[in-house]
Amino acid sequence: MKGVDADTFKKELLKQSIDELGHAEKIARRMIQLGYVPPSTLEEILKFTTCGQLTMPENVTDYESFIEKILRAERCAIAKYNELIKKYRFKDQITYELFEDLLEDEVDDEETWESFLEQYRRRKI
């Protein structure tokens, strides 16, 4: 990623990447508590994801496209966590609360990237 806004985006991506690793650890820990073996490779993880793998735009200075891709990923995660919250609401209180917490983080991330997109579009005009 290069250009005027690269440093701002890099800092936020690093922060959110660390947060996402924390999400993965929490989910893996819960899976183990329930007697499951969590996926351990990227290939295995991608089999379970309904959101797919995020790819960056070919033009590394196309910030608008970059942010829009991140927003699609955040919105997919939000939709998935909402589904899981509904699924576990009356079945498993601990898993339900876990997904509620993760959903809150994803909504915060979405709001951050929406703000970046709005700021970027205003600067572009």
PLM features per residue range, with description:
Residues M1-I125:
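Iron-associated oxidoreductase/ferritin-like identity signal
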